[in-house]
């Protein structure tokens, strides 16, 4: 018997389509999986300095640590986030967790009461929606549109605020679109939050995977007077998703958040501490040689694969896509009239069965129309070329029944 609060929780990235792909794999059918942003499975290697730090610290990283995290790790995170312009916080305002995926539910459980509302972008990674549902709160979606390069509209955000709204969440860079929010848009969101006295939550897990010489701006750096929580980690930027290392930074005015902070401390105590061996590499990862940067500059593997898949998708009749500026996802639009698509999950299943390619439909990212899907462009170009060729061939005759 399952608790009622679980009824709305979903994970289409690892949901029914993923389970069908696993069934096919178990039957000996090879599947090209373009559904998860798990760099190591596509041949990406962690920096040598990070590996060496893990080995060197292995004997010292065996006991529980402080509930918020190892002091040395929090000091390194403090210095890093300060370098991005975030002020009004100390190492004691940092909580280290087993990835942002652990910290998001902790945060919303401590923050939200049943019936409270949190503004969440659409499309967006389902972690945050599920965390809101587990807190018995209501996610309210503000739409980001392809025609606007997937940027949020501060006016729409403002129009959705009610007396039950507690916070505005942004995901920057965005998953699944790869959009990067410019300073002027972030400033407008800060102005809305300030006017309505709302907290700002910012998921910035992809902040070190920005391309095209663009700058990632942490929204908390624009709001030193507001209570902000910034989430980040090493899973994606250092290709070590399995190490489970993330953090959240509480900055700005905290006088209004003392009960929330007390709740966070209680929840942190319940899990004792996060992964200590992973914490032992934080200082080296953040302040050592940033070899991961080589992936996202022109000629770098992630950048080249981004350029390829963007062009290949737009060359398929009936598909249009906006060029991602960060992360390793693209969220193309499919002409639903041309292909008679009314159910994007069925489209993904049909593609899986015929071409053995696993994608995630837009439904999995809080997108209310059946006209988008996400592609992970972590595979090498020769693999992406095969996948895009198969997708084009599939769509050349596909019409949903």
Language-model segment annotations:
Residues 140, 145-216:
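Active-site phosphate-binding strand-loop segment of PLP-dependent enzymes
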Residues 110-132:
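Conserved PLP-anchoring active-site segment centered on the Schiff-base-forming lysine
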Residues 3, 7-99, 106, 273, ...:
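N-terminal small-domain helix-loop-helix segment of the aminotransferase-like
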Residues 221-300, 310-312, 395:
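Conserved core segment of the aminotransferase class I/II
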Residues 133-140:
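A short helix-loop-beta submotif of the ANL/AMP-binding
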Residues 83, 158-159, 340-342, 350-359, ...:
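PLP-dependent enzyme catalytic core of the Aspartate aminotransferase-like
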Residues 283, 299-310, 321-335:
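Conserved glycine-rich beta-strand-loop-beta hairpin in the small C-terminal domain of fold type I
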Residues 27, 135, 195-196, 226, ...:
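Helix C-cap/helix->beta junction micro-motif
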